[in-house]
Structure formats: C-alpha cells, structure tokens
C-alpha cells in the first residue's frame, strides 16, 4: 500500500510538471461547461466522502498552484458546484469560455508587464489594488497573456471565476422573484417577507422598475422628497434623482447638499441598489429617528441611482458586464465612453483617445461623455442659480471594499485638507466594520490604482494598471470645491466581482447607510449632531407593523417600526464603548 501511494504521488507530480513549466490552463482545471444540472426532484443523497486518491490529488494540485484550500471551494462557476439551472446557450455564445484571474503583484516590473500585456490583448481589467489585479479573459487567451509576462507572474495567479456565463446567469433575478414582483408590485408598503426585508431590495432591479419606484416614494413622502432630473443620456433618457430634505421657508443661506451617485459603470449593479437603499432608509426613518430628522433638516441629499441609464439597461438586455455608456465613437463596433475617465480636471485621454475599444476610453476630448457633461453642468447650475452649497460627494462603485479620497490622477500634490479627509474616511470604515464586520481599506485614490507603493520607495512614478485622470472624484473636489469627496468601492473583494449575489444588497446598504450617518455627524460637528444611537437605528418592526406609513400616517412619537438592522448585534461589546471614545472625531479642521 505504501509503495502504491509513493507511485501515485510520483505519477501526479510527473503529470503536473508541465503545468508549472507551460503558461497555460488545462481543460481539466477550467471546464468550458458546467456539469449537467442536478435533478429537480427531492432525491437528495448524502455526498460520499473523498477517497484517498482524490484527497491526495487535490492536495498536490493546491500546492503546485499555490492555491489555498479555501479558495478552491465555493467559487462562482467552480467545477464542483453543480448549477440547478445551467446558463442558456445565448450566454455561452456571448461569453464563451471566459474566466476571471487574479494576479498577485509584488514590484513595478510586474505591474508594467501586466499593464502592457492587458493593453496589447485588449483585456478587461476588473479591479486592481496595491497587491492584486483581476482580469477577465477567454481561456484560449491565457497562454498568450502568460507568454507576455515575466516568470514570476506565470505562477502567481489563481482563478476567481471559472465559469463566467454561469455566474452571470445566476446574477439575474430569479424567476420566482420576478413572479413575486408581478403579483405584489414594488410598493414600499408591500408586506415584508419572512426576513423582514422590503421586497424591492430582495433582488437587483431594472431601470424600468427603479423609476416608478422613485415616483412612488415622491408621492408617498412629498413633504421631504422630490424627484428631479439631472440631464439626458445619449439615447435620450432622463437621468433621475431623488432630492431628500426638509426645506426651511425663507432661509437666505445656501442649502448645504450631499450628493450620492452610483452606476457610472453600468455593470456595477450593487452601487445602484445601494444608492436606492440609503435613500429609502433616510426617507422612511425621518419621523422615527431624531438623528435622521436632524440630518435632513441640516442637509439636502441628492441620490442618483445611476448616472448611466443607457449602459445599465444594456447590461440587463444584452451584455451583463458592459462598463461604459452607449454613445457612438469613431469606431462603430466599439461604442461607449468611460464616464469616470471623461471629466475635465486632469483629463489624460491623450494616451488612450485613439482606442475606443478600451474599457477605459475617455473620449476624444474632456467631457466627451455626454452623461458626465450633463452632470457637471447641473452641479454648476445648482451652485450658481439655486442657492446650493455642495459639501460632500460620494461616488459608489464596485468592487474591492475601499474608501478613496482625492487625488486620483496623481499622488502629488496632497489635497489641502488631507488630514480631515483621512479622519472622516477612517470613521466611515469603522462604522462599516461595526455594521457587518466588513473591512474597508482607506487610501488615496492614486494609491488604490498603483501597485505596492508603500513597499517600494522610489522617486520614479510607479506604473499604473488603469488610467486615473479625468475622474468625477477629482473634479468635484478641485473644480467644484467639494471638500469631502470620496469614491467608495463596495463589496466584495473578488469572489464574485461585479456579479455580487443578491443576498449582499441589504448588508451593503446597511453599511452605506451608517457611512452616510457618520458623514452627516462629521459635517454637522460633534456638538451639533451628537453620538449615533445604534440601538435606535437597529430596531425591527414589531409584529403586525410591517407596512411603512406615508406622510399622512406617521406618528412622530412612535419609534417602534424602523424596518432594518443597521448593526450586527453579535458585536455588542465592541459597540458599547464606541460611542464614548472611538467615535470621538478630533476636531482638526483646516479653515
């Protein structure tokens, strides 16, 4: 038996040697198609334990590929995961054998090589940090990519998504959810499901549902909600937004306003749902939470679910992972402009202006992206003619769980109020951690797109995976003088990427609601706003009180119905001391 085991190990090693020497995938490791769907009938049987040979094989492969065991299981599209409903042929025809790989980067040479190879092969960079880069590509292209990379990168990658078509298919609302919407609608007054979550946030919603939902909120809560139009898209659609606040009569002072936007990149569905969740939570909690009431009395909030309606609709109808808007370019077969690379401040489109097929194409000129131009003109008009003072801007994206502050285009110079930007960002990160124990990293936006800057000290500019000029973050901060501007990249850290399961909608919304509450407290001043009352914000509706009342039904003295958990109650000990000292922001503002 011992001799047999030794021979088995040698056989596996002999078969595995080509894997480490040849930069390519084996079809056995990354199947083009998932296994047949399991039976729909309740004939479940216990899974047989793994045999000695199977466990030995898995261990050897994991060690050869340097893949931690926990990363080999429960992955989207993992070959051991049998889909209940296999992806239709149309999705497989569009996405083929695409996978998503994560490359671990350690030095400038690796970053430069990866950036150059991605540009040469027109690859889709999903996300990047100072430690890793996620890239979507076809399995057939993997050997070509690895052949352009140094040897250190040829073995420092792992698959995040093995079967992109299946993962995309699973990201769309299920047929059961669609049936629920057809029967119950999407009214905020709809009875809650068994988990007390409003049905609107049980799944991602198409634009055709979001707009009527916004109108309904406006009609139900007209005393504090208005539906406004930011501008028009390339295809002629309105860019709707909700303006929330309690407007005092005859107040000559400029109204302090916070802008929260999402969906600049069409495929980032979680950003759209999160904007809606935070807006809904502020609206419905106004009469039940003194902190929310004070916040809406001091500030107006502008919530823009998606700056890119054309692209968002396109992700629902044609291509789930489309990024740009849908306007024409010089190449008819490569439409679209990246709406977060087309803003006028430090626009660096000269480098990529001749490549409309790039996922980060900024257009031929600053503000070539129609929706970004409309947004900027609306913002300027608000300050010039509508007595508005923008005090904060939050641009929601996905993914990688990062809180970024200016500047994006360069790490030099530092923003004038760097200390305050960092202080508030750290406070937001703490609020998120106490909400659902998720960790968000805080950094300058330039560092978030550069590799290992803290590890490698050099006077030379560090190479970048993506272009970073022309961002909305920098424009609002510099040109519009919005002192507290942030880009927040939401869940997750790459297990699903842009295809985040619907179960994450409510937890992510809870995290960003508390982030907005911390932002409001910081802007109001510690004495003016007071500590957040976590217990007040975390109440669930009592039995029989599942309906959300409209303006005419609200009882100012009843605070029992607040509909959501905004904090993980398993972390009580950590939160009890938080109001006393950890939440005590140091008042170090630079006047």
Swiss-Prot record:
Location of the Peptidase M14 domain: 203-523
Disordered: annotated segments: 533-591
Matches recorded under InterPro entries: Peptidase_M14
Coiled coil segments of this chain: none
Cofactor note: Binds 1 zinc ion per subunit.
Cofactor(s) annotated in UniProt: Zn(2+)
List of residues binding substrate: 265-268, 323, 340-341, 398-399
Record-level Gene Ontology MF annotations: zinc ion binding
Signal sequence coordinates: 1-21
Metal-binding found in the keyword field: yes
UniProt binding sites for Zn(2+): 265, 268, 397
Ranges annotated as biased composition (Acidic residues): 546-559, 573-582
Chain positions carrying an annotated carbohydrate: 350, 381, 386
Biological process according to GO: cell wall organization; proteolysis
Protein family (similarity comment): Belongs to the peptidase M14 family.
Name of the protein in question: Inactive metallocarboxypeptidase ECM14
Species in which this protein is naturally found: Paracoccidioides brasiliensis (strain Pb03)
